[in-house]
Amino acid sequence: MNKGWLELESDPGLFTLLVEDFGVKGVQVEEIYDLQSKCPGPVYGFIFLFKWIEERRSRRKVSTLLDDTSVMEDEVVNNMFFAHQLIPNSCATHALLSVLLNCSGVHLGPTLSRIKEFTKGFSPESKGYAIGNAPELAKAHNSHARPEPRHLPEKQNGISAVRTMEAFHFVSYVPIKGRLFELDGLKVYPIDHGPWAEDEEWTDKARRVIMERIGLATAGEPYHDIRFNLMAVVPDRRLKYESKLHILKMNRQTVLEALQQLIRVTQPELIQAQKPTEGQSTEETKSAALKAPVSQESHRAHHGSHRNATDVGAEPPGALIRGPVMSAYSKPNSLAQNGGTVAAPASRLPAFLDNHNYAKSPMQEEEDLAAGVGRSRGVPPPAPDTDEEEEEETENVRRPLTPPGFKRRSSEPLPPPPGPEPGVLAEKLKETQRDLCSPLSIKTGAPTAPHSQPSPTPSNESTDTASEIGSAFNSPLRSPLRSANPTRPSSPVTLHLSKVLFGEEEPLLRLDCVRYNRAVRELGPHISTGILHLSKDGYLCPLSRLETGKVSPKGNKVEEPRESSEPDTERSRVTEVPQGEKFSPKELLALLKCVEAEISSSEACLREELEKRKKFKIDDQRRTHNYDEFICAFISMLAQEGMLASLVEQNISVRRRQGVSIGRLHKQRKPDRRKRSRPYKAKRQ
C-alpha cells in the first residue's frame, strides 16, 4: 500500500483529467495567476502548492506540531472529510478529495460517493487508510504521472535520498459551515482560519490567508515566487456556456415573436399588400411562358395604364413585395418604362449580391433583365415543350391562380430570336425556384411564428421563418451596449429588412443609444440568466417579474406564449394597444442584436473551452508516454554505427573544460586532494 504512488505535477489540466477519472462530473481545475483580483464565479475550493521545509521532515510523515488554530474536537474533525496522508506522493489526490468530499453540490460519481459514505464518522487516520486501500484512486493517480525511471541515481552515503531533490506539497482551503479551513494531510488536525466577513466571500478571506503565508515564507518579497502555485476547483465551464447558450437562444426566439406580433399590429399593410401581389406574380409567370410576342407599343401602353391603376393603391412606400420579385425572372425581355421612354440600364451590383433578390429592388431587377438576358452565359439550346409544361405546373402548385377581379399585368418582351427563347425562359424559371428555396431570402418585412418552414402555397401571413430574420443580425463579439455602434457595415439582409420596416437605409447604424436601447437597458442584464416572457399583448418581461411564484420547466416557459400569441393577433388589432409605449420595433431590433452578440460571445467561449480540454489530453499523453524504448533504440543505433564511444568522449571532455561535475568522477577527486603521502609525490617526481 505504501509503494507505487508516483509524483504528480502541479498542472490544472492534469488535475482536471484526474477529477474526471475519479468519476466526478461538472468540475474542472483552473490555475490562479493573480491573488489581488477577485475570483469570478463559484469556487468549490483552493489547492495550494508550496515547497516543503526540510526541518519538518521526519520518518513519521504526519507532523505533531499544534498551534492555536488547530481544531482538536473529534466531533468537528470526524464530521468533515479530513484524512492523514499515510502514503508518500499522494498529497495531490488528498488535496482533491479534501475539496470534493466537503462540497454538497458536486456530482461525485460512484467511487467517491462510496468512499464518502463508508468513511462517514471515521477518524483522520482511518480515512487515510481508506484512501490507501482504494485501488481505483491509485490507478487514476498513477495514470497521469510521468513514468518512473528504471535506474535511480546512486545515493551518497549518509545523505537521505529525499533530501537530494526538492519536495513540494499540496494542501486545500475549503469553506465548511461558514468557516475557512486549511486541510493538510501531513498535520494531525485541520486548521481553522475563522469566518469571513458579511460583505465578502470566502474566496476573499482565502486569498488574504494565502498572501500572508507567502509573505511570511518569502520575507516580504513580491508575491510571484515560483515556489508557490494556486489552483481553484470550479464548475465545468463547458456546462456553463451550454446552459447560457440554451437560454440565449430561447430569448432570441421570444424577441423575434415579439417583433412579429408588433409588426402585425403596427404595420398591417405589409400583410394586406401581399395577397394581390402574390396572385399577380402567378399571372405574370403564366403570361410570360405562354403568350406569343406582340408589338412593343401595345405592351407599353397596357403596362403603363396597369401600373398607374395598381401600384399606387397596392404598394406601400418603401415596402418590398414578393410579386415583383417573382415576375422579374419571368420577363426576360421586358423594358423599364418612365413616361414612355426606355430607362438606361442600372449599374451592376457586386458579383456575390448580383443574383440575390433581397439585394435589389423589383424595378432594378426588371431593368437588369431587360438590359441583358443571356449575360455571361452562352445561349442554351431550345428546350422541348414538355419542359415548359413542367415549369408551368410547378409554378401553378407553388402559387394559386389570380382571382377573377385582378387585372393581368402583361409582359414587355422584345422581339427575341426564334430559337433560344424557351431555353432561356426555362433557365430563368429554375433560378427563380432556387432563389425562393434559399433559406436566407427575405421577401417581406413581417416575420411569422418560429419553426415554420417556407410553404409552397401562399397564406395571409409572411412565409419567412424566425431563424432567417435572426440570421440578419449576427454581430461580432462586443458588449451589448456597443452592439448598435457603426463599427462594421450591416449585411444586405439587415439593411433591406430595416428599410422595409422603417423606410430608412441604415437605421441600425443610426440607432440612438439613449432612445432605442431602452430594451437593452431593461432586459439586457436578464437575457443570459433568465427566460424572457412574452405576454398576450406583446409586452416583454423576465420571468422573475411575473406575479406567479412557481416557474414552469424550461421547455414550457416559451412554448405557452408561442401558442397563445398567434390566436390573439386579431384581438390585439381590434383593441389597438399602443405597443410602442413598451418597446418599439427599433428597440426590439437593438435587443435582438444584443442577444445575437451574447450568443456569438458564448459560442466563442465554448469553443475555447473545448479546445482547452483537447490540449489537456494532448499534454497528458506527452507527459505519460514512456520514451525509454525510443531512447534505447537510438543509443543502440549509435553504437552499431560506431558513433557512441566518440560522442561520449567528446561530451566528457567538454564538461571537464567547463568545470561541470559528472557524478562519480567528481566525487573521486575530493579525496585525491587530501592525499599527501610522500611515495605518491616521489612517484610523481
Swiss-Prot record:
Any Gene Ontology biological process: protein deubiquitination
One matching Pfam family is: UCH_C
Where does this protein have compositionally biased stretches of type Acidic residues?
Answer: 385-394
* EC nos: 3.4.19.12
Where does the entry annotate site (Transition state stabilizer)?
A: 85
Which residue numbers does the motif Nuclear localization signal cover? 673-678
All copies of the UCH catalytic domain together span 4-235
Q: Where is the protein situated, by its record's location annotation? A: Cytoplasm; Nucleus
Q: What keywords are assigned to this protein?
A: Chromatin regulator, Cytoplasm, Hydrolase, Nucleus, Protease, Thiol protease, Ubl conjugation pathway
UniProt xrefs under CDD domains: Peptidase_C12_UCH37_BAP1
Q: Which SUPFAM superfamilies match?
A: Cysteine proteinases
**Record-annotated site: Important for enzyme activity:** 184
A GO CC term assigned to this protein in UniProt: PR-DUB complex
Q: MF terms per GO, please?
A: chromatin binding; cysteine-type deubiquitinase activity
Under the subunit heading, UniProt states: Component of the PR-DUB complex.
- What protein am I looking at? Ubiquitin carboxyl-terminal hydrolase BAP1
From what organism does this protein derive? Xenopus tropicalis
Organism lineage reads as: Eukaryota, Metazoa, Chordata, Craniata, Vertebrata
